[in-house]
Curated annotation (Swiss-Prot):
Designated gene of the protein: PCA1
Protein's UniProt name: P-type cation-transporting ATPase
CDD domains from the UniProt entry: HMA (cd00371)
Keywords: ATP-binding, Cadmium, Cadmium resistance, Cell membrane, Copper, Ion transport, Magnesium, Membrane, Metal-binding, Nucleotide-binding, Translocase, Transmembrane, Transmembrane helix, Transport, Ubl conjugation
Topological domains, Cytoplasmic: 1-556, 613-620, 681-808, 866-1161, 1210-1216
NCBIfam families, sorted: ATPase-IB1_Cu, ATPase-IB_hvy, ATPase_P-type
């Protein structure tokens, strides 16, 4: 938009209004400290509680009332009186003087009209506002609207406030798009039924004048000073519309649709001066930001650095804590969707959603039906009767979700506390299955975690957690996977602390404990140390270190189970004493006391089992282990009650067992669960890669002072010192010192790696004898350790095929046990009556004892845990040796590897080509210069080698345009004089018959040809060195009977020479292979079309090891794709296994870990089958001379699960 077009048509008019140079004001406000701005506003309210006054009109007359000030403003608005009353000095505005920051009053240009819908008096703006139509609710941000991409809606105060010069009050507001892609036109803004219109009945001082002009909404309001607008913006792709938006915003030129032209005063000379000023201002800002857009590509980051509002569409901000800050500069909403009014400090009020603190709650249908509010706002200094009309939008529940503030999908991670077996996991999956908004679900019993993609248009996280809590007994908590977090200890109650003003960069607060707050923040805006030390108005301190959420959830659940078990033991001991003491067991008082204690155990300790079993039956249609516990313990307890009743009436039953059976049964079950949880928690924690993270760092400030700090307080820009033999706290670049670093625990590299200035160091590695000064490059939560741990966790969330088999067996196990129990009960009644000649009552009692024992001694959990516990340990063991399994299926099949296919360059070789011979024809300098211009910037190893070689010889690159790389073939471009330049593989360029090319190929070199207009100008012979462990790895793989292959896009001579050195058959190599040909070759092997007849008995398992982008298709096609870490990110994403260090012997590590893991899985299956078989036979009385007493059957879970966990843990100490 051209400046002259923007300001055309301006002239004199009867209606006049004031103009404020908002560029100067906004820069001054944005550069000011936020806390200082807020402090000033508080002081201003304390000194002047009169309302809005004009700086020149009213400040010099302190006794003026708000009504008098407003009356003068209306006189200016309607009669065009002396403009100096309003302080509208254009010269001051233009020169950036003090008056540019003074409060100014916007005059209105027509008389008030009554809005027919709400009955509110609204000042007309000489346009559509007079009709009371929809435009009265349209507005724009900072006087500028998104013309073709989106429109932002802003709720601002329409009230008058007294402020001193240069004081900028901070107004909180939210902006909400009505569609996920943003509003496409001003017609997308529509008015909705307001909640509690009583609060909006009076607009005497709160006038909001809105009209539209040239498809751009313009807004003006009665406002002393331009308020700083705070939004949370998500930068989008910036374009020229952003430049126009910023330029318009800087000018603060308010134009309205209609025939009435608006000027600064009634004087034509003043109008001309004003128009000239705004035109110049617009042009200056337009040119400035056009240049920034051209150079940086994104203006948002530049504005963010300056503390300014983004030029792109803002998004809604939310607080997921228990309450939002009363002083925070942002507004928040809860799931109720209702706007309420909440008292804050002083005489401020805030439109809020916290129904718990509401003075009133909206009862309109718009709030009861809508889950989302259109607009929230902070109103300063006035009561609800003075709040002007709220600009709201149409209900948008189909487009906007409270948790994310937009449509689309969001990746959610939930911690799940309370899962103990695969039955629990199956129940969780069924509960998720009832939710249409959940997709891509992954659950992990071992990690106690669930991940899924949430369709925000169909539900929120709160809805999901509410449904899960209703249908299952587990406890859920969302784990944040965005930004950074830090826990701090606050000096008073956490619920009060969240009402403190939030520093810039803080996005969310969450109450962890009574006086511990978890802060979510953007580390690029504010560092953790600054946040803790200087971010708050009250002193806070960093909280004690807590484990990763997945481990922390397990710890908390372990504590709960431990406390419950301890209580059960305490209550059971007196029962056992009274039952086993001969002098006490026959007394009614003793038995009555036992009954009371047993009842507490049955309904307090074992009570959750009842609820869990009922939820599983009702909501998930599952019969699980909890049902067996409920049936067995209930039978024992009811039998004891009945037996006690007979004893009281003087007809005791033959059995002497009373309440000790049910009580001891419950207690032993709890002991078994506690020990199992403890072993499982220790197992997971022991192989956690995050345990390698150091806990402290030595910070070096600008003066050289050294301070030891908690590692969580590191922030961008820090320099830390690494002492000899200490662990490196986080990733960084060495800026001073030299040493050798042991990276074995991170990369598996056994030899120390030399480090010097500009070397990269990674978190978790151990420094040698030297001292290093390192500049931080990655924060602890995003460093190498965290990245590796994330990939390992992803593998733990996947399930191998063998796990599906185990789950299927476990699902039939409980119904089978119930059937065996019924059969056992019936058989023992028959045996008691027919064989043992017992009375019917005695036969029934005996049958009940055997039935109870069968129910409780069996353990389906051992079958479900046999696979996942081993795979979790295996993935951790492999990670500590530099091998990252990205899926459990890779662990399952790697031990069956039958073929290993290698890419040559960068995989079998170092990937660092060197030029050994050069042939240049014609003008040598010109050819080399053109070639350097062509290859410079191309990331292919050959192009990089050529460019490096030419630069070392002092060649200067010529300008080459239209450069394009064709993967696996060539790179081409055009010289400044129009010459067609090509370089690359001689075969694809059609020069393989050139004598120089043939000579180089015969010698086994890789050949690079350079042609100009189709004629060969230069030929380069290159060679690459084998990796140090290539020969030994190939030999060991061959000894295991694995077939070896080489695929390469390189020349045939170089590939065959490499194969000969490694002893690989010529029939198993392919040269000049394109990515598609590599994929086809691997596919033939996988499908058995390229295998020996001896290997046709089972499907081949093919491992393809590559590093480049051109290997990505092959990595996907193979059974297992292995990526070398120094390769491209595309290849890394396509791979199933990632090698942290480019060492080929890691392939052997991968296969060995898989072999040992699968051996332990089979061993666990064997144990689970053996245990359940013999335990059930013993419990059912199959052995005449021996059977398990029912009170000791509760040890079954302990006896069955501990060996499984023990076998898995032994993998840590296996020789790999």
């Amino acid at each position: 938009m051209k400046p002259e077009k923007l300001f055309s048509g301006l002239g004199t008019s009867d209606g006049e209004y004031g103009v404020v140079n908002s560029e100067n004001i906004s820069i001054d406000a944005m550069q000011d400290n936020r806390g200082e701005c807020h402090r000033r506003s508080i002081e201003m309210h304390a000194n002047d509680n009169l309302g809005l006054v004009s700086q020149r009109d009213c400040t010099n007359r302190p006794k003026i009332t708000p009504q008098e000030c407003l009356s003068e403003t209306e006189q200016i608005c309607h009669h065009g009186e002396n403009r100096t009353k309003a302080g509208l000095d254009v010269d001051d505005a233009e020169t950036g003087g003090d008056h540019t920051n003074e409060s100014r009053v916007d005059e209105c240009c027509a008389e008030k009209v009554n809005d027919t819908e709400t009955g509110l008096d609204v000042d007309s703006c000489c346009g559509d506002a007079q009709t009371g139509g929809d435009h009265t609710n349209e507005s724009c941000v900072d006087g500028c609207c998104v013309r073709d991409s989106s429109v932002m809606v802003e709720e601002v105060t329409g009230s008058c406030e007294a402020v001193s010069s240069k004081e900028q009050l901070l107004t909180s507001f939210e902006v909400v798009p009505s569609k996920s892609e943003g509003l496409q036109s001003i017609h997308d803004i529509r008015e909705t039924t307001r909640c509690n219109t009583n609060s909006n009945q009076h607009t005497g001082k709160g006038r909001l004048c809105i009209e539209s002009s040239d498809s751009t909404l313009k807004k003006r309001s009665c406002k002393v000073s331009r308020q700083k607008i705070e939004v949370s913006s998500k930068p989008e792709c910036c374009n020229i519309s952003c430049v126009e938006r910023i330029a318009s915003r800087s000018c603060e030129k308010r134009t309205f649709k209609g025939s009435t032209n608006v000027g600064i005063s009634g004087s034509s000379s003043t109008d001309s001066l004003s128009e000239k000023f705004f035109s110049e201002q617009y042009s200056r800002m337009y040119n400035r930001y056009s240049s920034i857009l051209k150079n940086l590509g994104c203006i948002c980051n530049y504005l963010r650095t300056l503390g300014k509002e983004s030029c792109c569409l803002p998004k809604v901000r939310f607080c997921s804590g228990e309450g939002a800050s009363k002083k925070t500069k942002y507004s928040y909403r809860n799931s109720s969707g209702c706007l309420t009014k909440k008292k804050t400090h002083g005489d401020k009020e805030r439109l809020s959603n916290d129904n718990g603190h509401a003075d009133f709650v909206c009862s309109k249908s718009c709030c009861t039906k809508m889950k989302d509010c259109a607009v929230t706002s902070t109103i300063s200094g006035h009561s609800s009767s003075e709040i002007s009309r709220i600009v709201s939008m149409e209900p948008i529940e189909n487009h906007l979700n409270l948790e994310a503030g937009s449509t689309g999908t969001e990746h959610i991670v939930l911690s799940v506390s309370g899962m103990s077996c695969t039955g629990c996991e199956s129940k969780l999956k069924k509960s998720f299955g009832a939710l249409k908004c959940v997709h891509g679900l992954k659950t992990s019993l071992i990690l106690s975690q669930a991940e899924f993609n949430l369709d925000l248009a169909q539900g929120s996280v709160k809805d999901v957690i509410k449904h899960l809590s209703k249908t299952t007994e587990f406890k859920y908590e969302q784990i944040s996977n965005h930004g950074s977090t830090i826990d701090v200890v606050v000096p008073y109650a956490a619920k009060d602390f969240i009402n403190e003003e939030w520093p810039q960069g803080v996005t969310e607060l969450k109450i962890v404990e009574r006086n511990i707050i978890r802060i979510y923040f953007d580390p690029k805006v504010i560092g953790a140390r600054d946040l803790v030390n200087e971010g708050w108005s009250v002193p806070v301190s960093i909280a004690p270190f807590s484990c990763h959420p997945t481990i922390e959830v397990g710890r908390k659940h372990l504590v709960r189970v431990g406390c419950t078990t301890a209580l059960s033991i305490i209550l059971t001991i007196p029962i056992l004493v009274m039952a086993w003491a001969p002098q006490l067991r026959e007394k009614i008082s003793t038995i009555s006391a036992s009954m009371v204690l047993a009842t507490i155990i049955q309904f307090v300790i074992a009570g959750p089992f009842y609820l869990n079993a009922l939820k599983s039956l009702i909501f998930s249609r599952l019969i699980e282990m909890d049902l067996l516990i409920v049936l067995s313990t209930s039978a024992a307890y009811i039998f004891s009650i009945v037996s006690f009743g007979y004893f009281v009436v003087g007809r005791p039953l033959s059995t002497e067992q009373f309440f000790e059976t049910s009580s001891l049964l419950v207690t032993l079950i709890m002991v078994g669960r506690f020990v199992s949880e403890l072993a499982r928690h220790r197992a997971v924690k022991s192989i956690s890669v995050r345990s390698l993270q150091a806990s402290s760092a030595i910070l070096v400030d600008k003066t050289g002072k050294e301070t030891e700090i908690n590692i969580r307080l590191l922030q961008y820009g820090d320099i830390f010192k690494v002492l000899p033999d200490s662990r490196i706290p986080t990733d960084g670049t060495v800026i001073s010192g030299s040493s050798e670093v042991d990276e074995a625990l991170i990369t598996g590299e056994s030899m120390p790696v030399p480090k010097k200035c500009q070397s990269i160091v990674v978190a978790g590695s151990v420094n040698g004898t030297g001292t290093l000064f390192v500049k931080l490059s990655k924060l602890p939560g995003n460093n190498t350790i965290s990245t590796i741990a994330t990939m390992v966790d992803e593998a733990k969330l996947t399930k191998p095929k063998i796990q599906n088999i185990a789950d299927k067996i476990a699902s039939y196990f409980v119904p089978t046990i119930i059937g065996i129990t019924v059969v056992t009960f019936c058989v023992w009644i028959a045996v008691g009556i027919r064989v043992e000649k017992q009375s019917r009552s005695d036969a029934v009692i005996q049958a009940i004892i055997y039935a109870i024992t069968v129910l409780i001694v069996s353990c389906p959990c051992v079958i479900g845990l046999a696979v996942p516990i081993v795979f979790v340990i295996a993935s951790g063991v492999a990670a500590k040796r530099g091998v990252i399994f990205k899926s459990a299926e890779s662990i399952e099949v790697a031990h069956n590897t039958s073929h290993v296919v290698f890419d040559k360059t960068g995989t079998l070789t170092e990937g660092k080509l060197t030029v050994v011979h050069e042939t240049v024809r014609g003008d040598r300098h010109n050819s080399q210069s053109l070639l350097l211009g062509l290859t410079e910037g191309i990331k292919h190893p050959v192009s990089m080698a050529i460019a490096s070689y030419l630069k070392e010889k002092g060649v200067s690159a010529q300008n080459v345009s239209n450069t394009k790389a064709v993967t696996g073939k060539r790179v081409e471009g055009t010289s400044y004089s129009g010459l067609k330049l090509q370089g690359g593989n001689c075969r694809w360029l059609g020069h393989n018959n050139d004598p120089d090319v043939r000579k180089a190929l015969e010698q086994g070199y890789s050949v690079f040809c350079f042609s100009v207009n189709g004629s060969v100008t230069a030929v380069y012979a290159l060679e690459d060195s084998l990796r140090a462990d290539a020969v030994s790895t190939i030999n060991l793989l061959r000894q295991r009977g694995i077939s070896l292959h080489i695929l390469s896009g390189d020349d045939d001579g170089a590939v065959r020479s490499m194969a000969a050195r490694l002893g690989i058959e010529s029939s198993n190599i392919r040269s000049h292979a394109t990515p598609a040909e590599k994929s086809e070759y691997i596919k033939d092997i996988v499908e058995g079309r390229n295998c020996d007849s001896s290997s046709q008995s089972k499907r081949p398992v093919v491992v393809f090891c590559g590093d480049g982008t051109n290997d990505a298709i092959g990595l996907t096609q193979a059974t297992i794709g292995v990526h070398i870490n120094e390769g491209s990110e595309v290849a890394k994403l396509a791979a199933d296994v990632v090698m942290l260090k480019p060492k080929l012997n890691n392939i052997l590590t991968m296969i060995t870990v898989s072999q040992k893991a699968m051996f332990r899985v089979k061993l666990n299956f064997l144990w689970s089958f053996t245990y359940n078989l013999f335990a059930i036979l013993l419990a059912a009385g199959a052995f005449v001379d021996f059977h398990i007493p029912p009170e000791y059957a509760g040890l079954g879970e302990l006896v069955s699960i501990l060996p499984v966990i023990f076998v898995a843990i032994l993998l840590r100490y296996a020789k790999i």
